[in-house]
Amino acid sequence: MRTEYCGQLRLSHVGQQVTLCGWVNRRRDLGSLIFIDMRDREGIVQVFFDPDRADALKLASELRNEFCIQVTGTVRARDEKNVNADMATGEIEVLASDLTIINRADSLPLDSNHVNTEEARLKYRYLDLRRPEMAQRLKTRAKITSLVRRFMDDHGFLDIETPMLTKATPEGARDYLVPSRVHKGKFYALPQSPQLFKQLLMMSGFDRYYQIVKCFRDEDLRADRQPEFTQIDVETSFMTAPQVREVMEALVRHLWQEVKGVDLGDFPIMTFAEAERRYGSDKPDLRNPMELVDVADLLKSVEFAVFAGPANDPKGRVAALRVPGGASLSRKQIDDYGNFIKIYGAKGLAYIKVTERAKGLEGINSPVAKFLNAEIVEAILDRTAAQDGDMIFFGADNKKVVADALGALRLKVGKDLNLTDEAKWAPLWVIDFPMFEDDGEGGLTAMHHPFTSPKDLTAAELKAAPENAVANAYDMVINGYEVGGGSVRIHSGDMQQTVFGILGINEQEQREKFGFLLDALKYGTPPHAGLAFGLDRLTMLLTGTDNIRDVIAFPKTTAAACLMTEAPSFANPAALAELGIDVVKKAENN
């Protein structure tokens, strides 16, 4: 039906007769002439109808936005004064000789100026996806997956599919369950990841595996989370953690080079402990120059319990955050920041405004100045490298609250004061995570997942002091987003059972949930390691949007609903009966 795409016409096509298929993006009726911007997947081109082709001109008068049409015409160069530098096709236009209206469009539920609520965009997603910026994002996503496949093929990885209907295993979030008709009362789980299957593939001798795969997690959603999401899943045998990171870093550098024309360079490596200490986060945004600085040793003897208490507590921390130029912040702005950090458990926000450093105590403005002598103030200013016009914020509490609160404040202030270099790319690896973290109920939970290997520990050493164990795990972070994470896996049955035991999984439960894995570990399991990237998040970064729903064709809302299809929906009672399921209705309040 077509000979060319609208968005691909250039000066090289001048004089050629072309047939185009697409939609009316905009129509301008000048009486004797009608112009339309005609759109398809590749872009927009201007088409005009003149009186010399009366039939086509008459039919063109009926055109409205989003009519689906076919146009045949001749490509012409625009007059120099009419060239549109903002359009890829802006040097040419098409003089139409024939027009076919393939399908008309009703009045549109979306605003033609594209000022629409997200609810409307999701309900009429098929119209929203016609917008050039949305089409471009999905084309970029397709390019990314194509580049990934070629790279992985070139590096000896095999694309192997793993099951969608599998067994529920504890991986940190709730499972989506699928009832079995054949085995009434039993359920499959949709996979949160192919974790165990890819490990079993390594035990099967496939050496290098990858898969671009859907995963499912029934969890409370945030702006950058979806109940179903896509992973670039990778596993290798006989490779160390640095070797895995080297290959995966090469993949990501390749993507940025091909999609953005950007050389990311070598990725720095930072331990979890250093990231938390310097940036208050295990996914630091290195485009932001501000760092947290420990000052507890300077404040142990001050007569101000807010500082002295945490400074003398082994589990406490007092840290400072210097904000370049922050002395210009108003009292209201400071109060707003104080309220902001309360979200993260902080009780308040102490600060020092540095107006004239050379004057010592007289050169600062601070509500806590009365508790500090000149020597302490000078030491704080030295350690934070404060200059005239700077602001120093303080966090004083337990270590987690200080890291969370000042880490979040660092990001917010960086954006508010334009201190974060938005034009920069800042990738890094974060390694050496704690193996376990407190579950809040006196026990331990795996920081990554229970199949992660500890670093340089025997099973006996791990069992003796699990709270001090470091995991052989690594995350890739770009501009403050965790885009991928992985680890060296446990390849010893004894070690795996030890980890299960530390997590409070007794032997009976181990057999019930992981018997197949424990059995497989008995038969010559190779050392193996892997990683998974979030394709949605990678695409989000590479397309420059901050909304993950912009890079998924048919996403869910934050309530895990599809507004277009109205999923989830009630099931047919007959289908439920066949599955042996009764739906219990909530009692209405009297």
Swiss-Prot record:
It is found in: Cytoplasm. Its EC number is 6.1.1.12. Keywords: Aminoacyl-tRNA synthetase, ATP-binding, Cytoplasm, Ligase, Nucleotide-binding, Protein biosynthesis. L-aspartate binds at E171, R217, H448, R489. Residues 195-198 are annotated as: Aspartate. It is an enzyme of class 6 (ligase). ATP binds at R217, D218, E219, Q226, E482, G534, L535, D536, R537. GO terms for biological process: aspartyl-tRNA aminoacylation. GO terms for molecular function: aspartate-tRNA ligase activity; ATP binding; nucleic acid binding. It holds the Pfam family tRNA_anti-codon. Its main location: cytoplasm. Homodimer. This is Aspartate--tRNA ligase. It comes from Citrobacter koseri (strain ATCC BAA-895 / CDC 4225-83 / SGSC4696).
